[in-house]
Amino acid sequence: VPDLPVASARPASVRLLADQAFSRAAGAPLVGGNAVRVLRNAAEHFPAWHDAIRAATRSILFESYIIEHDAVGASFRDALVEKARSGVRVRVLYDWLGSPGKLGRGFWKPLAAAGGEVRAFNPPRFDSPLGWLSRDHRKSIVVDGALGYVTGLCVSAAWLGDPLRGREPWRDTGVEIRGPAVADVERAFAQVWSIAGPPIPDAERTEAASIAPAGATAVRVIADAPSAAGLFRVDQLIAALARSRLWLTDAYFVPMAPYVEALRSAARDGVDVRVLVPGASDIAILSPLSRSGYRSLLEAGVRVFEWNGTMLHAKTAVADGRWARVGSTNLNVASLISNYELDVAIEDERVAQRLEECYADDLEHATEIVLLRKRRHVAATPVAPEREPAVRRAMAGSAGRAAAGALRLGGAVGEALTQPRELATGEGRILVVAAAGLALFGVVAFRWPHVVSWPAAAIGAWFAAAFLLRAFRSWRQARRARPEGSIRWVRSSAA
């Protein structure tokens, strides 16, 4: 936890209250006795993952939002197949929407034949028309219940870059964890695994008490589920408690209004608040959406930087050189409210200072966005004059990120419509796009009403059938579960 302002003579009790507040906000306890190593980019992640898989003797849990059918994906599949053949229990979980079309039908057959298990999270279901909105965006690996990885990287060659085509590696961050907190990472995997099918047997689960301490670092594993918003609450607490600096990195930055206000308030109080985001996103529409929110941050004193490389995919925060966060959660409504996400909050000066060093290095390859005071326009000021922003797309966004982008578009348009201030150029473009889309929809609906009415009728019938089916299943389950002598509510006639 960042340094707390203590007005009384009982700092220990204040610290206890702070720990309680963070535990309640995150829905996760603070676990001590861990060793944490910061990993940068695929060049450090992928070799570490392969080494861990090769060293496994009992179990491997492998979870990723995206697993590409490319050289990187095949290398990990083959490594898992080899361990499964040797008797190691291997379980792989990937998101159905994050990886459609990326995995051929036969991609996982060798692993299944070797005795491994593979599950796709949340494929479409007839009785849940909107269920696809909740995705498993987590990226984690647990080996033998004693070694864990939590990161922002997916399994794809895009993170390695392509020197022949002039594409730099994607910038990303994760951590390697040894110690009792690994049990919480395993528990997070087991939670989503049980949603996708039968649960992991209790006999195969690892208890934190059975893991020997590996260091002195305290870790909080924040396993967010739809509507839980644990990380959102934690980040707001950190913004309120930070005293000197709060440095954020985010890949798809369209934050909700309460968090924007928390950052603005911290900056007004003199906290050095910085936000580092991609200059060029793998989702083309996202950059103007992110930029539409810069002005309110800049006017409050928040410093905003855009990464000049191919793609910045990291999701990190570091406060006061004492507290750090690393994981899969982006600062937008899709990640904070609708997805299954996994992050670790780390209370350790060594780890926090290492992330601050990484942040300072990243700013050497970034462009600062500033306000031109004369007309209050947003402009770019190079931080590293030897480098110009690289505006190119490394690869097309996945279907899952495209769906999340639609949610972000709605949020950004709402902000632009409701803010009582002059619109920036980026915001004006968003409104033009929204207006053009609505106008086109209106013309089509007026000229060819059947083009709109028929799909609407089909969707309405689908929703109605799905709701009736779920209601029937719920009623049937309730009847089966009702024991003899169960309590029933009756209206009392007494005054």
What are these regions (language model features)?
Residues W462-R482:
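Membrane-helix interfacial anchor on the cytosolic side
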